[in-house]
């Protein structure tokens, strides 16, 4: 018996009538290229999935499985914070991920690209418990190569699939239309974001509207205030309306288009550190910048981050 545990099984849109199919065919060809439909997903939609294959999904495309009891019962209600835990509970013994690649032969490097978190955590969990796990990387040359923490050596995996058939167009749905209501909500959201804060944006028109509103706030402050005042009959006291002098830190499981625009606009630029004590000192303003001063050393000493005074 095969149990597939995955986030989202995406298939190209199909028309339900001859007219719909004629309309969609050129659009689908342009947007999705040679993206292959997942056979198990097609069988699931048609209610023809073999009984020895079970699919558990922790995300589902809205409306795809209306009236499909088997697919609905296979849904796992979770979020990315707990995905690795909930996948391990399913008793998995193989993890496979599409990866980006750079170089050839001994110089080959792989990148878990835009979705590295789950695989790393699953591998760590299984290694800590001494449980067997076959790790498979499938190279897709069209995946974006993300560096730093997402970059790994091929030796991390037990199997690296280099079949050219695995290189295909990525699934990229068109952006949803941003409505006036979306923009209004985005403006309100942008007025709640503190300079020096942390930002998470999801997929969809609300995220796009919020990103645009943050850019307007930073670049066109007077216009931002004027529009916000028209939406707030009780005034904008207590709202965040100034430009981003310190910048924001972007923290999200999704690298959405709005994030890219905020990076290009210089708004997402705040650096953070993988040290809770050091980061708290920075957040509290006890360490102002990267210049090491006597005040910096005193703050580190008082916090226990430096364990003994330094002498000349």
What are these regions (language model features)?
Residues 1-312:
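Conserved alpha/beta enzyme-core scaffold
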């Amino acid at each position: 018996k095969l149990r597939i545990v995955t986030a989202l099984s995406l298939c190209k849109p199909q028309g339900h009538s001859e007219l719909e199919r004629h309309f969609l065919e050129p659009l689908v060809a342009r947007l999705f290229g040679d993206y292959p439909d997942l056979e198990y997903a097609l069988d699931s939609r048609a209610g023809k999935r073999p009984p020895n294959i079970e699919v558990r999904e922790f995300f589902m495309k809205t409306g795809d499985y209306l009236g499909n009891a088997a697919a609905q019962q296979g849904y796992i209600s979770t979020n990315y914070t707990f995905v690795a835990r909930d996948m391990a509970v399913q008793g998995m013994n193989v993890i496979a991920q599409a990866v980006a690649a750079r170089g050839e032969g001994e110089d080959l490097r792989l990148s878990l690209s835009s979705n590295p978190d789950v695989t790393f955590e699953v591998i760590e969990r299984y290694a800590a418990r001494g449980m067997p796990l076959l790790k498979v990387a499938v190279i897709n040359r069209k995946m974006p190569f993300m560096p730093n923490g997402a970059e790994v050596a091929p030796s991390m995996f037990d199997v690296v699939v280099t079949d050219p058939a695995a290189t295909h167009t990525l699934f990229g749905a068109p952006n949803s239309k941003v409505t006036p209501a979306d923009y209004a909500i985005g403006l309100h959201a942008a007025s709640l974001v503190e300079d020096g804060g942390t930002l998470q944006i999801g997929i969809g028109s609300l995220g796009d509207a919020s990103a645009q509103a943050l850019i307007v706030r930073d670049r066109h402050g007077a216009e931002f205030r004027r529009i916000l005042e028209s939406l707030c009959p009780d005034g904008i006291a207590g709202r965040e309306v100034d430009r981003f002098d310190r910048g924001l830190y972007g923290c999200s499981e999704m690298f959405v288009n709005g994030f890219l625009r905020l990076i290009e606009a210089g708004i997402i630029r705040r650096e953070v550190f993988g040290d809770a004590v050091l980061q708290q000192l920075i957040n509290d303003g006890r360490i102002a910048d990267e210049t090491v001063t006597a005040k910096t050393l005193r703050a580190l000493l008082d916090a226990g981050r430096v364990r003994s005074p330094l002498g000349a």
